[in-house]
Amino acid sequence: MGLFSFTQEIAMDLGTANTIIITNGKIVVDEPSVVALDRRTEKMIAVGEKAKLMHEKTHENIRTIRPLRDGVIADFYACEQMMRGLIKQVNTRNHLFSPSLRMVIGVPSGSTEVELRAVRDSAEHAGGRDVYLIFEPMAAAIGIGIDVEAPEGNMIVDIGGGSTEIAVISLGGIVSNNSIRTAGDDLTEDIREYMSRQHNVKVSERMAERIKINVGAALTELGDDAPEDYIVHGPNRITALPMEVPVCYQEVAHCLEKSISKIETAILSALENTPPELYADIVHNGIYLSGGGALLRELDKRLTDKINIPFHIAEDPLHAVAKGTGVALKNVDRFSFLMR
């Protein structure tokens, strides 16, 4: 980056839960997709981790927004402000004036034309000059290290915060895909509802997220790897008195059952639409899991048992899409599947 390099290249995984930015092959920003705005002036107060700390704790003059819902932009203005704020965090100090941005952004494979347009417009408003889009399962496959241009079939299941993307990839294209709006956020919401219904305790989105991370599981039998019970503090729903409730992984596994079944059904439906030759490749290679949802205890085992095809968790599931987007950024001229 010299004083006169006029183009800065950044790759962005614009996620419902987290936004990750890569520049020069390194992750430079990895922050929650949250922005805090002043209600009176609509000016940005905080973005990322700082805004997340304010989430669910604000007074009437501040609103915290998660601009993406179900993997797509729900609040256009907030999304643009958030992208601007996060791009600012990327080191641009050593320029005399702000460079023009070349960007590659990951988008859900089930996006409509309107949704793709919204991402592109947001990026352009946030300073992007040259904006390319890549479908997330394709980016995840590249990030995992799969040769996506090879004439063989690979299946990716990317479980993010807002959507689960399932795609069969061959010869640099998506052969069959299925994108459902059941993902990490729904698991968190299932836990919130369960705690309220079963234990009469009110828990915040963040507390439900902690429960999911500490004792979340896809199976009710974990054997020796079972996590210890997690103690939840919160107000009684009826009396508002403080409560202390221990939660075990078995009950969490039960309450996540419905959402996980939806993901299983979506995977089976994508396999049904896969041509037989590619299906044979997938059985041979196994199916790759990426995204934060891949970290749910024993999810890979449950899916392997249910579908009879081995499931492999990506090496760094949280950053697979971002890494793949970073590789795409270096190969903008070569990868014909990038959308302009």
Language model region names:
Residues 1-159, 167-287, 294-340:
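Nucleotide/phosphate-binding catalytic cleft detector across ATP-hydrolyzing
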